[in-house]
């Protein structure tokens, strides 16, 4: 049993050596014969290989290598077992050859790795060569423990699980050969099964290298360093292509998808049934993401990734900025370089799947060639498929992006055609009902019978092209009367709200990210978009502004900020006033709807309302009176009926019809100029636009006059409001003054009343006090006490009593009141003596005078005692 284990292990070593030689040969051949830019030719077979078939050719090369390895195992099994010494010598020689081949391959990779696509593949080849070197060195350093093993563990040894990775020990080959000769029994069937389990895919070499490199320390001098988990390079391989199972080694890869796996990943099913030993290496593996590439330019290196149409981080920095500023709300137009890159890819993509599968089906039917040429061809195909995957993935992004753009364009054109056809049908019915009694209508300038072609061409034209495409020659009116009805039914009628060629909103499948920027797209006769115009929708003023109204999006942002600052009440008042003013009639008799001037030049319907009886102004000559009278009901027409002078007497005046909302043909009477005008108008779309703009400018004077009248009315309204406010303020002022005066009078009246009341109270109080004092004087003071006769006789008793009561003196009593009432006037009255005299000491009177308090001498002036002092 141990001998069988040893033979199986030696067989694994030989298989690894053969696989390493094959890989090195493939690397050298691919570096010499493979063009990394085109990835389409093979120098050996000279056959064109599409990038789509490269992923499907890869498993065939792997299975052929495995079949060759099986044949080598069957033929060399006995030699490996019986000759260990020769085998070790062969291994040393193979190591030297492999090292030389690896050096040559590295040089070839460095010389040929000039393209961006081949950089990742060169790194992968270097990692493969390093792993192959590690494999050869690790095989010699794996010690095997030949200790006796129980019989119960034979089932475990069949799965190659009991590897004992210990320190390196010398192997005794003599004892080993003796054990082998005694116990060896060959079982070819079991060896074949084990070989099928081992050699299913060339990636098993990397798996064994990972297991051995994580458990053994290698000498730095003899081997190259093993790449750490941080230096693992990611290669994009299909995620839906599972590793081949042990029972079916010739499995084929299925539909490729773009996900990533590392070059050093392990497959548990192909190495051993125990997942424990292999899962240890998964701890050191980092999850690698797919190499990111720009959707527009295909570059994989940029300082920052930006959000694109397909999601987060799908554009590089430059393309993201460009798409944000120019093409976010429109449709991206790839550059000329990208279109040139897509041409060979589109040609390869158009090939049917049956042709792509032909080379894959023909390979098993071919007879087996010698091993070396067949292996080289298959390995070259495998290398081409690996290198073409990054380029194919980048090109698929561009193809998908262009396909989505084309789908959106087709959907928009279909919707536009449906809207145009519906509006055309409605207008034709209206026109047929109104003009059923008329016999003559305006016709086309070209007298052709191809009416269906004209209808299909004019159905998708913008309203501007209808002016110059419809012309009438008055000289040929009589010959075209029979075909007027058919021709008129096929003339597109533009101008109504339903038949605007520019949609106000884009379809639901391609709505822009911002609501204020709807798209406007014109289409030519073939249905392809000729112009991508964007409109700006302001949510504050609730209007869609054309792109020509603003220089850039920043100016529109300033407009939105200004609208947001206005109060809502003021905006609503202005809108209501303008709506009221828009209903009034203008001077010319036309009704115009309120607008602020920033109207898209293709939309003439905003000016066309409520006009029922406006006839065209005709400058008729004598030759065309009958025809022009029949055309008097054709409103809104431009009639230039002059056969003599086309420059002097031409008069153009636009009259807008609001019931039919159409612009009929322009009547040019000069037959020589009609053909020239048609040819120049068809070949010059800018001239058509210019003519249309000039025609719109003719409406501006009427519009300006209406705006001026609106401003005057608003001014008068403001003046009236101001007068009303001033009158209200005056009334309030007068009322306030009256209130103040009334309040002041009330205050003064109250203060006077209070002062009078206080005065009357004081007088009453004084009188009462005087009365009481008089009562007390009669009680305590006798009437004749300190009374002296008065020198005069002018005071009466009553007056003395009143004066005494007011001056708080004692009452004056007349002693003769009771006795002599009749002689009061003749007698002297008595007067109370002053208290000073009462209490002062008696003094002798000075003869002839008296002295005052100051000691001054005074002479008495009494006539009775007149005496002069002696002169001394």
From Swiss-Prot:
Protein localization: Nucleus
MF terms in GO: DNA-binding transcription factor activity; transcription cis-regulatory region binding; zinc ion binding
Biased segments, Low complexity type: 188-240, 254-277, 349-393, 410-458, 465-489, 608-656, 806-826
Region of interest (Disordered), ranges: 15-75, 89-137, 188-279, 333-393, 410-526, 602-656, 663-682, 806-829
Residue ranges, compositional bias (Polar residues): 490-508
Top-level taxon of the source organism: Eukaryota
Outcome of gene disruption: Cells destined to become spores end up as stalk cells.
Zinc finger (GATA-type) stretch: 294-319
Primary localisation category: nucleus
InterPro entries xrefs: Znf_GATA (IPR000679), Znf_NHR/GATA (IPR013088)
Gene Ontology biological process terms in this record: regulation of cell differentiation; regulation of DNA-templated transcription; regulation of transcription by RNA polymerase II
UniProt xrefs under PANTHER family: GATA ZINC FINGER DOMAIN-CONTAINING PROTEIN 4-RELATED, LIM ZINC-BINDING DOMAIN-CONTAINING PROTEIN-RELATED
Function (record text): Probable transcription factor. Seems to act on the expression of the genes culC, culD, rnpA and sigB.
Name assigned to this protein: Transcription factor stalky
Species per Swiss-Prot/TrEMBL record: Dictyostelium discoideum (Social amoeba)
